[in-house]
Amino acid sequence: MRQSGRKSNQLRPISLELSPLINAEGSCLIKIGNTHVMCSATCETTVPPFLRGQNQGWVTAEYGMLPGSTSQRIKREAAQGKQGGRTQEIQRLIGRNMRCVIDLKKLGERQIIIDCDVINADGGTRTAAITGSYVALHLAIRSLMKKRILKVNPLISQIAAVSCGIYKGEAILDLDYLEDSDAEVDSNFVFAGNGNLIEVQGTAEKEPFSEEQFIAMLKLAKGGAAELFKLQNQVLLGA
């Protein structure tokens, strides 16, 4: 039994609050247990230099953790003058995954910037950021179409992400911080709406893990992603 009392295939309680930020084209506050991430999507009429004149858009992401989001205060990276390696890795992960589910040609010469700010961290911040960012992106596209800035919907698919791990010899879904810090294996799965994989990250923390253990984690992750897709659809249809 997990310390939280959850079953091995059980997600933490999840909520998606739509449009908490009034100035962004789209925003979502995602809460997965005690992990809370504010996700927003903002449109700019500029693109990176390598895309100028190609009538093609771009989606990029920025990620950060508020100083009080963990048990010990995190120093602001802006105050230190540079981003840490973890921050760069996660925001690149979010950006490239978001680009997989949008037709950049249909976006035109525009850039959508996804901002993910971790308010409270209790494991799974990057997967929560991806799941919440899709909702923010969807709302931003809806806003741009309503304003007739976009004539066609460039979104190709839903996207959601979830963590899995091997904890005390058992495959479990959606690790919290205590589980993550003591897991034998830590992995993240990113899925498209049709169930196909977009990205997989997996690391053995103590000993190599078997193919059977990987398949067990994959099955749990796929089931968890299906629940996340259902919740995304429910809140977006009701908006």
From Swiss-Prot:
Keywords from UniProt, A to Z, are:
Nucleotidyltransferase, RNA-binding, rRNA processing, Transferase, tRNA processing, tRNA-binding
EC number, UniProt record? 2.7.7.56
Give the disulfide map: none
- Positions contributing to phosphate binding: R86, G124, T125, R126
Q: Which PROSITE patterns match?
A: RIBONUCLEASE_PH (PS01277)
- Name of the protein: Ribonuclease PH
The biological process GO terms on file are: rRNA catabolic process; rRNA processing; tRNA processing
Q: Which family does it belong to?
A: Belongs to the RNase PH family.
Q: Which CDD domains match?
A: RNase_PH_bact
Where would you find the membrane-spanning parts of this chain?
Answer: none
Organism equals Rickettsia felis (strain ATCC VR-1525 / URRWXCal2)
- InterPro entries with a match to the protein in the record: ExoRNase_PH_dom1, ExoRNase_PH_dom2, ExoRNase_PH_dom2_sf, PNPase/RNase_PH_dom_sf, Ribosomal_Su5_D2-typ_SF, RNase_PH, RNase_PH_bac-type, RNase_PH_CS
On subunit structure and binding partners, the annotation says: Homohexameric ring arranged as a trimer of dimers.
Top-tier EC class = transferase
Q: What does this protein do?
A: Phosphorolytic 3'-5' exoribonuclease that plays an important role in tRNA 3'-end maturation. Removes nucleotide residues following the 3'-CCA terminus of tRNAs; can also add nucleotides to the ends of RNA molecules by using nucleoside diphosphates as substrates, but this may not be physiologically important. Probably plays a role in initiation of 16S rRNA degradation (leading to ribosome degradation) during starvation.
Catalytic activity, reaction form: tRNA(n+1) + phosphate = tRNA(n) + a ribonucleoside 5'-diphosphate
GO terms for MF: 3'-5'-RNA exonuclease activity; tRNA binding; tRNA nucleotidyltransferase activity
